[in-house]
């Protein structure tokens, strides 16, 4: 088997694994009524999704660093096996508490599947080829977003909600087999140090922070006792983040090497990624609310109205992958930022009488901007460092993105009049959403500014090649 065929097999395995991890974030949503109907525990509804995302976020930087130390293949297989074990156990869960714990296990494995594939692509392909392949890989997230609720609904209607977890097993096993038999790595034999104090302090800090954000977003966060718990969690989070930073500065193999942030490309890419993901989560969560609460349309219609974004995002990812080696990082970033600014201004001026064609245009531009910008930044981060730091670099960028989404949905949630869309007066809801979209437009201006200051990626890659 020649090298090109081997590389194709590895790439297929990575695409499959990425799709499985991505779709698990959305496929459960349509199955939740059936799950709560059988297992009861409606009050724990939100934790089925939240615990998966929380576990994934916490383990992302850990897998990134361990893949630099022990190899991509080893850590990918370990993560995939944990993910499949969590999937199988979720399928046999008999109580809501069991399902929550098994979803947490699934998320612990998903941290590897959302990070290491991008790192392996960075290892296998040259800069020009890498951009195209990562563009296709980024489009998988958009495809998963579209197909997740659809697949979930079909499996629940025709088989069982348990099938949404069992379906991961055959595809996951194929991905593990293809990668384990095709990927070859030459690791330098040396004593390796695992930063256990860093892992522990980071895990505690992130768990407390994300749990506090979850309480703030949910109705559980109302009341004096809940407010006290939120303050306590945030205080613990700050203390352990400070401890984590001190440990990392002294560690010979830090989980998040601070030297990464001295690299201007990575520093600017992380700032841009954070802002983009704050905006991204607002668009995804609050546009459907506008459709239901202001336009007075049913939930099904709001899902259909988001299709332009779901189509434009993969399209933007593919275009970014094909253009970045020709046009450059700054060109793609600025183009994406301009589309985002135009769409966010459009959203901030919408009314109940805004024609559907304009709403579709704004939504399409938003999706195109996310595809162009986020994909080009992924390519930039994986290309800006050498092999021994690539896992940590990609993982840190993924972590920054999730942090942006978490903070975005929490802060903008506080600006919104709480309640369900059918119980809020359309004029009141429109006013709250206009405030949110106004601040999204302001943030979009900062995205444009950061994009204009983005370094030239080709020069950095060439310098890296010369150094090696």
Residue ranges and their predicted role:
Residues 35-36, 66-67, 151-159, 213, ...:
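Interfacial helix-cap and linker-helix signal at transmembrane-aqueous boundaries
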Residues 10-23, 28-30, 49, 81, ...:
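12-transmembrane solute porter fold
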Residues 1-6, 454-468:
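Intrinsic disorder in cytosolic terminal tails and internal cytosolic loops
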Residues 157-272, 297, 441:
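Hydrophobic transmembrane-helix bundles of small-molecule transporters
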Residues 50-64, 114-118, 307-320:
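Central cavity-lining transmembrane alpha-helices of secondary-active solute carriers
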Residues 60-197, 387:
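Helix-loop-helix hairpins in multi-pass membrane proteins, especially solute transporters
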